[in-house]
Amino acid sequence: MRQEEVVIRGGSVVTSYGIVEADVWISGGNIRRIAKDSLPKEAKGTARPNEIDASGMYLLPGFVAMPERPHGRIRRLPEYLDAIRLLIRQGYTCLVDTLQPEAWMDHPQVRYQTAMHFNNLIDYTWQVELPASRLNGETVRRWCGEGYRLLRVVVRRPEELFRMDWETISPLLTSYKVMLQLRVPKEAGLNGEERLRLHRQWLSLCRCWQIRTWVDGEASLTFEEFDPYYHVFRLRGEDCERALRHLAGHWFRSLPVIAALDEVQVNLRRREWDPESLLCLLVRVASTNAAKAAGLYPRKGCIIPGADADILFLKKEHWLTKFVLSTILNLSDFLLPTSVMSKGKWLYRNQCFASTIGMGRCLLDIKPYNYVI
Protein backbone atom coordinates (compact mmCIF):
# COMPACT_ATOMS: atom_id res chain seq x y z
CA MET A 1 0.00 0.00 0.00
CA ARG A 2 1.35 3.40 -0.98
CA GLN A 3 2.25 5.57 1.99
CA GLU A 4 0.39 8.85 2.39
CA GLU A 5 2.20 11.94 1.17
CA VAL A 6 3.19 14.33 3.96
CA VAL A 7 4.23 17.97 3.83
CA ILE A 8 5.99 19.61 6.78
CA ARG A 9 5.44 23.35 6.61
CA GLY A 10 6.92 26.30 8.45
CA GLY A 11 9.96 24.57 9.95
CA SER A 12 13.64 25.58 9.96
CA VAL A 13 15.76 22.84 8.38
CA VAL A 14 19.10 22.44 10.16
CA THR A 15 22.04 21.35 8.00
CA SER A 16 25.73 20.91 8.75
CA TYR A 17 26.51 24.44 7.60
CA GLY A 18 23.39 26.52 8.17
CA ILE A 19 19.66 26.78 8.76
CA VAL A 20 17.11 27.40 6.03
CA GLU A 21 13.36 28.00 6.14
CA ALA A 22 11.75 25.39 3.89
CA ASP A 23 8.86 22.99 3.49
CA VAL A 24 9.62 19.27 3.28
CA TRP A 25 7.68 16.81 1.10
CA ILE A 26 7.74 13.16 2.16
CA SER A 27 6.46 10.20 0.17
CA GLY A 28 7.13 6.49 0.50
CA GLY A 29 9.30 7.07 3.57
CA ASN A 30 11.74 9.30 1.67
CA ILE A 31 12.20 13.04 1.32
CA ARG A 32 11.06 14.02 -2.17
CA ARG A 33 11.37 17.79 -2.23
CA ILE A 34 12.60 20.68 -0.10
CA ALA A 35 11.42 24.16 -1.03
CA LYS A 36 9.52 27.16 0.27
CA ASP A 37 6.14 27.52 -1.40
CA SER A 38 4.66 31.00 -1.41
CA LEU A 39 1.34 29.82 -2.89
CA PRO A 40 -0.56 26.60 -2.16
CA LYS A 41 -0.80 24.14 -5.03
CA GLU A 42 -3.85 22.05 -5.77
CA ALA A 43 -3.85 19.35 -8.45
CA LYS A 44 -7.20 18.04 -9.61
CA GLY A 45 -7.81 14.36 -9.18
CA THR A 46 -5.12 13.88 -6.51
CA ALA A 47 -5.52 13.63 -2.78
CA ARG A 48 -4.29 16.52 -0.70
CA PRO A 49 -1.14 15.68 1.24
CA ASN A 50 -1.25 15.49 5.00
CA GLU A 51 0.18 18.77 6.30
CA ILE A 52 2.19 19.07 9.51
CA ASP A 53 2.65 22.50 11.03
CA ALA A 54 6.26 22.89 12.22
CA SER A 55 6.15 26.62 12.92
CA GLY A 56 8.59 27.60 15.64
CA MET A 57 10.53 24.35 15.31
CA TYR A 58 13.93 23.23 14.11
CA LEU A 59 13.93 20.19 11.81
CA LEU A 60 17.06 18.10 12.37
CA PRO A 61 18.22 14.88 10.71
CA GLY A 62 18.12 11.93 13.08
CA PHE A 63 21.33 11.16 14.96
CA VAL A 64 23.34 7.93 14.69
CA ALA A 65 23.68 5.87 17.88
CA MET A 66 26.98 4.05 18.52
CA PRO A 67 26.52 2.49 21.99
CA GLU A 68 29.30 0.60 23.73
CA ARG A 69 26.88 -1.99 25.10
CA PRO A 70 25.48 -4.18 22.30
CA HIS A 71 21.71 -3.87 22.26
CA GLY A 72 21.39 -7.13 20.34
CA ARG A 73 22.55 -9.04 23.43
CA ILE A 74 19.49 -7.98 25.41
CA ARG A 75 17.34 -11.11 25.61
CA ARG A 76 14.15 -9.85 27.29
CA LEU A 77 11.84 -8.06 24.86
CA PRO A 78 10.47 -5.44 27.32
CA GLU A 79 14.01 -4.48 28.36
CA TYR A 80 15.09 -4.33 24.72
CA LEU A 81 12.19 -2.10 23.70
CA ASP A 82 12.87 0.22 26.64
CA ALA A 83 16.51 0.57 25.51
CA ILE A 84 15.50 1.37 21.91
CA ARG A 85 12.83 3.83 23.04
CA LEU A 86 15.41 5.61 25.17
CA LEU A 87 17.54 6.06 22.05
CA ILE A 88 14.54 7.47 20.19
CA ARG A 89 13.76 9.79 23.10
CA GLN A 90 17.31 11.10 22.84
CA GLY A 91 16.99 11.80 19.11
CA TYR A 92 18.58 8.70 17.57
CA THR A 93 16.91 7.25 14.48
CA CYS A 94 19.64 4.81 13.40
CA LEU A 95 21.77 2.36 15.37
CA VAL A 96 25.25 0.98 14.73
CA ASP A 97 25.26 -2.11 16.95
CA THR A 98 28.10 -4.49 17.69
CA LEU A 99 28.06 -8.19 16.82
CA GLN A 100 30.50 -10.22 18.95
CA PRO A 101 30.65 -13.71 17.38
CA GLU A 102 32.65 -16.52 18.93
CA ALA A 103 35.08 -18.48 16.78
CA TRP A 104 32.90 -21.63 16.88
CA MET A 105 29.70 -19.95 15.65
CA ASP A 106 28.39 -20.85 12.20
CA HIS A 107 25.95 -18.78 10.12
CA PRO A 108 22.68 -19.90 11.84
CA GLN A 109 24.18 -19.27 15.28
CA VAL A 110 25.30 -15.79 14.24
CA ARG A 111 21.84 -15.07 12.87
CA TYR A 112 20.39 -16.08 16.22
CA GLN A 113 22.58 -13.44 17.89
CA THR A 114 20.92 -10.80 15.72
CA ALA A 115 17.34 -12.05 16.16
CA MET A 116 16.30 -9.53 18.82
CA HIS A 117 16.75 -6.69 16.34
CA PHE A 118 13.85 -8.06 14.30
CA ASN A 119 11.77 -6.10 16.85
CA ASN A 120 13.70 -2.87 16.30
CA LEU A 121 11.80 0.37 15.89
CA ILE A 122 14.62 2.12 14.01
CA ASP A 123 16.99 1.16 11.20
CA TYR A 124 20.26 -0.46 12.23
CA THR A 125 23.51 -1.82 10.88
CA TRP A 126 26.23 -4.02 12.34
CA GLN A 127 29.90 -3.79 13.11
CA VAL A 128 31.57 -7.15 13.74
CA GLU A 129 33.98 -7.24 16.67
CA LEU A 130 36.95 -9.59 16.33
CA PRO A 131 40.18 -9.99 18.31
CA ALA A 132 43.32 -9.13 16.35
CA SER A 133 44.48 -12.76 16.56
CA ARG A 134 41.46 -13.88 14.49
CA LEU A 135 41.73 -11.22 11.79
CA ASN A 136 43.10 -13.34 8.95
CA GLY A 137 42.23 -13.73 5.29
CA GLU A 138 39.66 -16.48 5.82
CA THR A 139 37.81 -14.56 8.54
CA VAL A 140 37.79 -11.29 6.60
CA ARG A 141 36.55 -13.06 3.46
CA ARG A 142 33.74 -14.72 5.44
CA TRP A 143 32.35 -11.57 7.02
CA CYS A 144 32.77 -9.46 3.91
CA GLY A 145 31.03 -12.15 1.87
CA GLU A 146 28.06 -11.98 4.25
CA GLY A 147 27.72 -8.26 3.61
CA TYR A 148 29.38 -6.68 6.65
CA ARG A 149 31.46 -3.57 5.98
CA LEU A 150 32.41 -2.48 9.53
CA LEU A 151 34.93 -4.54 11.48
CA ARG A 152 36.01 -3.62 15.00
CA VAL A 153 39.41 -5.03 15.92
CA VAL A 154 40.23 -5.62 19.59
CA VAL A 155 43.93 -5.04 20.32
CA ARG A 156 45.34 -5.51 23.82
CA ARG A 157 49.11 -5.32 23.22
CA PRO A 158 51.13 -3.37 20.61
CA GLU A 159 52.85 -6.51 19.34
CA GLU A 160 49.48 -7.87 18.15
CA LEU A 161 49.50 -5.24 15.40
CA PHE A 162 52.64 -6.68 13.83
CA ARG A 163 51.44 -10.28 14.06
CA MET A 164 48.49 -9.47 11.80
CA ASP A 165 48.89 -10.64 8.20
CA TRP A 166 48.43 -7.21 6.61
CA GLU A 167 49.62 -8.37 3.18
CA THR A 168 46.78 -10.90 3.03
CA ILE A 169 43.92 -8.96 4.59
CA SER A 170 44.57 -5.51 3.08
CA PRO A 171 43.59 -6.47 -0.51
CA LEU A 172 40.34 -7.96 0.83
CA LEU A 173 39.57 -4.93 2.98
CA THR A 174 40.22 -2.46 0.18
CA SER A 175 38.37 -4.59 -2.39
CA TYR A 176 35.24 -4.84 -0.24
CA LYS A 177 35.80 -1.28 1.06
CA VAL A 178 35.65 -2.23 4.73
CA MET A 179 36.09 0.29 7.53
CA LEU A 180 38.19 -0.90 10.48
CA GLN A 181 37.64 0.37 13.99
CA LEU A 182 40.31 0.01 16.66
CA ARG A 183 39.22 -0.92 20.19
CA VAL A 184 41.72 -1.03 23.04
CA PRO A 185 39.81 -2.33 26.10
CA LYS A 186 40.44 -0.77 29.48
CA GLU A 187 41.30 -4.16 30.95
CA ALA A 188 44.34 -4.27 28.63
CA GLY A 189 46.15 -2.33 31.35
CA LEU A 190 47.92 0.15 29.07
CA ASN A 191 48.85 3.55 30.43
CA GLY A 192 48.16 6.76 28.54
CA GLU A 193 51.50 6.86 26.74
CA GLU A 194 51.32 3.20 25.67
CA ARG A 195 47.75 3.63 24.44
CA LEU A 196 48.72 6.72 22.44
CA ARG A 197 51.70 4.92 20.89
CA LEU A 198 49.46 1.99 19.93
CA HIS A 199 46.97 4.37 18.29
CA ARG A 200 49.73 6.01 16.28
CA GLN A 201 51.09 2.65 15.12
CA TRP A 202 47.60 1.54 14.07
CA LEU A 203 46.98 4.75 12.13
CA SER A 204 50.34 4.46 10.41
CA LEU A 205 49.66 0.86 9.33
CA CYS A 206 46.18 1.70 8.02
CA ARG A 207 47.54 4.62 6.01
CA CYS A 208 50.34 2.45 4.62
CA TRP A 209 47.87 -0.24 3.46
CA GLN A 210 45.23 2.34 2.41
CA ILE A 211 42.55 1.07 4.79
CA ARG A 212 40.04 3.51 6.22
CA THR A 213 39.74 3.39 10.00
CA TRP A 214 38.33 5.17 12.99
CA VAL A 215 39.85 5.32 16.45
CA ASP A 216 38.98 6.98 19.71
CA GLY A 217 40.40 10.48 19.72
CA GLU A 218 42.92 11.30 22.43
CA ALA A 219 43.76 14.74 23.79
CA SER A 220 47.38 14.25 22.69
CA LEU A 221 46.43 13.47 19.08
CA THR A 222 46.73 16.39 16.68
CA PHE A 223 44.25 15.87 13.85
CA GLU A 224 46.29 17.90 11.35
CA GLU A 225 49.17 15.41 11.36
CA PHE A 226 47.03 12.49 10.20
CA ASP A 227 45.43 11.53 6.90
CA PRO A 228 42.17 13.46 6.33
CA TYR A 229 40.56 10.56 4.44
CA TYR A 230 41.82 7.29 5.90
CA HIS A 231 41.78 8.43 9.54
CA VAL A 232 38.55 9.20 11.41
CA PHE A 233 38.46 10.11 15.10
CA ARG A 234 35.59 9.38 17.46
CA LEU A 235 35.56 12.02 20.18
CA ARG A 236 34.09 12.17 23.66
CA GLY A 237 33.72 14.80 26.35
CA GLU A 238 36.20 17.67 26.36
CA ASP A 239 37.97 16.39 23.23
CA CYS A 240 34.70 16.86 21.37
CA GLU A 241 34.34 20.44 22.64
CA ARG A 242 37.88 21.17 21.45
CA ALA A 243 36.98 19.95 17.95
CA LEU A 244 33.71 21.91 17.91
CA ARG A 245 35.55 25.11 18.84
CA HIS A 246 38.00 24.46 16.00
CA LEU A 247 35.15 23.96 13.53
CA ALA A 248 33.38 27.07 14.80
CA GLY A 249 36.49 29.10 13.98
CA HIS A 250 37.02 27.40 10.59
CA TRP A 251 33.42 26.96 9.48
CA PHE A 252 33.92 25.36 6.06
CA ARG A 253 36.99 23.34 6.91
CA SER A 254 36.84 19.54 6.79
CA LEU A 255 37.76 17.73 10.01
CA PRO A 256 37.49 13.90 10.23
CA VAL A 257 35.73 13.69 13.60
CA ILE A 258 32.54 11.94 14.71
CA ALA A 259 30.72 11.71 18.03
CA ALA A 260 27.65 10.20 19.64
CA LEU A 261 25.29 12.94 20.77
CA ASP A 262 25.08 11.68 24.36
CA GLU A 263 28.90 11.83 24.65
CA VAL A 264 29.23 15.46 23.56
CA GLN A 265 30.30 17.79 26.35
CA VAL A 266 30.03 21.53 25.75
CA ASN A 267 30.31 24.39 28.21
CA LEU A 268 27.39 26.57 27.16
CA ARG A 269 28.64 29.45 29.32
CA ARG A 270 31.45 30.17 26.88
CA ARG A 271 30.59 33.30 24.93
CA GLU A 272 31.77 32.02 21.55
CA TRP A 273 28.83 29.62 21.23
CA ASP A 274 26.11 30.98 18.99
CA PRO A 275 22.94 28.88 19.59
CA GLU A 276 22.15 28.07 15.97
CA SER A 277 25.79 27.61 14.95
CA LEU A 278 26.28 25.07 17.74
CA LEU A 279 23.16 23.24 16.60
CA CYS A 280 24.63 23.00 13.07
CA LEU A 281 27.91 21.70 14.49
CA LEU A 282 26.10 19.01 16.47
CA VAL A 283 24.32 17.91 13.30
CA ARG A 284 27.64 17.88 11.42
CA VAL A 285 29.56 15.82 13.97
CA ALA A 286 26.90 13.51 15.47
CA SER A 287 24.64 13.01 12.46
CA THR A 288 26.21 13.76 9.06
CA ASN A 289 29.81 12.78 9.86
CA ALA A 290 28.71 9.72 11.85
CA ALA A 291 26.52 8.58 8.95
CA LYS A 292 29.42 9.04 6.50
CA ALA A 293 31.80 7.03 8.71
CA ALA A 294 29.26 4.22 9.05
CA GLY A 295 28.56 4.20 5.31
CA LEU A 296 24.94 5.31 5.77
CA TYR A 297 25.16 8.72 4.07
CA PRO A 298 23.22 10.13 2.18
CA ARG A 299 20.41 7.81 3.26
CA LYS A 300 20.92 8.95 6.85
CA GLY A 301 22.44 12.03 8.45
CA CYS A 302 20.86 14.71 6.29
CA ILE A 303 17.60 16.28 5.15
CA ILE A 304 17.93 16.27 1.36
CA PRO A 305 15.85 14.81 -1.49
CA GLY A 306 16.26 11.04 -1.61
CA ALA A 307 17.21 10.63 2.05
CA ASP A 308 15.12 8.68 4.52
CA ALA A 309 12.62 10.92 6.27
CA ASP A 310 14.25 10.58 9.70
CA ILE A 311 13.47 13.95 11.25
CA LEU A 312 13.62 15.41 14.75
CA PHE A 313 11.29 18.24 15.71
CA LEU A 314 12.85 20.55 18.29
CA LYS A 315 11.05 23.61 19.61
CA LYS A 316 13.18 26.70 19.17
CA GLU A 317 12.25 27.99 22.60
CA HIS A 318 13.58 24.80 24.21
CA TRP A 319 16.95 25.18 22.49
CA LEU A 320 17.46 28.93 22.73
CA THR A 321 16.71 29.09 26.46
CA LYS A 322 19.86 27.07 27.11
CA PHE A 323 21.90 30.13 26.21
CA VAL A 324 20.23 32.52 28.65
CA LEU A 325 22.82 33.47 31.25
CA SER A 326 20.42 32.82 34.12
CA THR A 327 19.92 29.17 33.19
CA ILE A 328 21.99 26.27 34.54
CA LEU A 329 20.96 23.81 31.84
CA ASN A 330 23.60 21.51 30.41
CA LEU A 331 23.88 20.28 26.86
CA SER A 332 22.49 16.91 27.97
CA ASP A 333 19.12 18.59 28.42
CA PHE A 334 18.96 18.82 24.64
CA LEU A 335 18.11 15.13 24.56
CA LEU A 336 14.42 16.04 24.54
CA PRO A 337 13.16 16.46 20.98
CA THR A 338 9.48 17.33 20.84
CA SER A 339 8.74 14.65 18.22
CA VAL A 340 10.68 12.02 16.28
CA MET A 341 9.83 10.73 12.81
CA SER A 342 11.44 7.80 11.01
CA LYS A 343 10.83 7.10 7.32
CA GLY A 344 7.87 9.47 7.40
CA LYS A 345 6.13 7.76 10.33
CA TRP A 346 5.88 9.00 13.87
CA LEU A 347 7.96 7.15 16.44
CA TYR A 348 7.51 9.61 19.27
CA ARG A 349 4.94 12.38 19.55
CA ASN A 350 3.04 14.12 22.35
CA GLN A 351 5.22 12.26 24.88
CA CYS A 352 3.96 8.92 23.55
CA PHE A 353 5.67 6.21 21.52
CA ALA A 354 3.96 4.73 18.48
CA SER A 355 3.44 0.97 18.31
CA THR A 356 5.85 0.43 15.43
CA ILE A 357 7.67 -2.68 16.66
CA GLY A 358 9.62 -4.33 13.86
CA MET A 359 9.65 -1.28 11.57
CA GLY A 360 13.45 -0.99 11.64
CA ARG A 361 15.44 -2.36 8.70
CA CYS A 362 18.83 -4.06 8.75
CA LEU A 363 21.09 -1.96 6.51
CA LEU A 364 24.02 -3.95 5.15
CA ASP A 365 24.43 -2.19 1.80
CA ILE A 366 26.59 0.47 3.42
CA LYS A 367 29.51 2.31 1.82
CA PRO A 368 31.96 3.69 4.41
CA TYR A 369 34.53 4.70 1.74
CA ASN A 370 32.29 6.97 -0.32
CA TYR A 371 32.63 10.33 1.42
CA VAL A 372 35.36 12.48 2.92
CA ILE A 373 34.36 13.68 6.38
Set out the residue ranges of the language-model regions.
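Active-site microenvironment of metallo-dependent hydrolases
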Residues: 1-22, 26-27, 35-37, 84-90, ...
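Short hydrophobic beta-strand segments
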Residues: 2-10, 48-53, 215
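Short, ordered loop/turn segments at secondary-structure junctions
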Residues: 39, 69, 99-101, 129, ...
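Metal-associated gating/positioning segment near the N- to mid-region
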Residues: 39-113
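Active-site neighborhood of phospho(di)ester-bond hydrolases with catalytic His/Asp-centered motifs
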Residues: 60-67, 94-99, 127-128, 216, ...
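Active-site mouth loops of central-metabolism enzymes
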Residues: 65-78, 125-136, 155-156
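Mid-domain alpha/beta scaffold segments of enzyme catalytic cores
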Residues: 101-138
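Histidine/acidic residue-rich metal-binding segments in metalloenzymes
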Residues: 109-115, 134-257
